Amino acid sequence: MRNSFNMTTLEKMRGLMLTGMADQYQAVLSMPAHQQPESAVMLALLLEAELLYRNHRRTQTAIKNARFRYQASVEEIICSQDRNLTRETLSILADGSYIDRGENIIISGATGCGKSYLASALGYQACMQGRKVAYFSLPKLLQQLKSDKLDGSFRKDMERIEKMNLLILDDWGLAPLDTQSRLALLQIIEDRHNRYATIITSQLPISSWHSYINENTIADAILDRIIHKANRIELMGESLRKNNTKKQF
């Protein structure tokens, strides 16, 4: 009778989608009776298991929705004097406090130096900390927003972008901007200014960004909001793609 009661309880847990709790309860039931914890301890174990399970699912969903270019982690980042990146700097950024302060990160450097990989790693770290992250190639994002104007989804997508705890804009400066793209970019930056963090990666030095935007008033507005509260990383050294075998950047 007790075994039947236990199985019914297990079925109810699964029916209520308490997957973590059900898995832990099943593990407890497989133990010898004299090793099974008392009811109060068991309840605490089951609740903890369910909490861990839901946090894990939430994190995995956030990582999937972010659509990172690379599956990267901060532990895999190569820090050296030659790269102009120290482990101390990386550790400070990895704690995520810049996100809480609404600060930006600008990662610049030549092609193949690991800009996108570093941005992906910081984004992945933010997801692990329970934050909402979105990763975009800037040219593709701006093209998508043009299409949104035609099908009526522009406002919805802009609101989603605005509310991300961390927005990553990769490939800044890779494609020229037209008037519509400049205005969309300005709106993105303005909506997030002083509230949410943005990571930008670019082959262009910051000194060239004004001419890249190519419209004085809009360039002034965008750059004032991006650069004012930005942590700058200029990666150096040879391309890491040449001799890379473990996708470690």
Roles of regions detected by a PLM:
Residues 85-163:
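Conserved P-loop
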Residues 14, 18-69:
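Interdomain "pre-motor" coupling segment immediately N-terminal to P-loop NTPase/helicase cores
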Residues 1-11, 243-249:
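Intrinsically disordered, low-complexity and often Lys/Arg-enriched segments
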